[in-house]
């Protein structure tokens, strides 16, 4: 991969200032103060909120505590989506800090998966990494790794260790020089305006005549409604990690540098904010 290490670091160390508030109907023995945290964009809510859980459990009776879950403006937050994706999709036009409501009862079974332990997060994360490598390298790279390499990827993410993670992840970002890129680009496109969870299709980074495909090419093919006509006004923002990459950016470069740790490009299409 081309080595723009500063970009990789900026992506990894991206943080969202967040204020956690206990839901007003939760029963407490004394008033629950809000809890403030800088959330890592590349991680998962249930992986980085142990302190939040402990903070609120201090003012609650044991019998009133069941599985913790989070909500933003009435929408339950899917823990298996990376934090940065959740923010871009649901809250990118709101003021900071991001205000998240904490619940300990009435778990929304229809909307959320249960997350009883960190093992569940690890299993989900590794499943995504394996799916991404199946698309990129027919699973050859991930299958050639040892168990300890898989563990190092996970521990690097869990403990927020950039160098530990990238020592292994860089192997997943390599490809033979003669091929100009991966077999297919692992991506998911999310929209708040549709019931469909996300769009995911096979898409190559290089065209049959050897031209590098761009982000714009991908959107025109799989989500044409996201792209403004040449003479029309822009109706949507296309966001990855809180920024709007230029539509001319090669998809291969984006995949190598702006993928989340699960090796997918998580792309949010959100309505253009009206001033």
Swiss-Prot record:
Q: Does the keyword Cell cycle apply?
A: no
Coiled-coil spans in chain: none
**InterPro entries tied to this protein:** Atg5 (IPR007239), ATG5_HBR (IPR048940), Atg5_HR (IPR042526), ATG5_UblA (IPR048939), Atg5_UblA_dom_sf (IPR042527), ATG5_UblB (IPR048318)
Alphabetical GO CC annotations of the entry are: Atg12-Atg5-Atg16 complex; autophagosome; axoneme; phagophore; phagophore assembly site membrane
Q: For the cross-link Glycyl lysine isopeptide (Lys-Gly) (interchain with G-Cter in ATG12), list the residue numbers.
A: 130
Modifications after synthesis and translation: Conjugated to ATG12; which is essential for autophagy, but is not required for association with isolation membrane.
**Cellular location(s):** Cytoplasm; Preautophagosomal structure membrane
Keyword Transmembrane helix present in the record's keywords: the answer is no
This protein's major location comes to cytoplasm
Q: Give the protein's recorded name.
A: Autophagy protein 5
Species whose genome carries this gene: Bos taurus (Bovine)
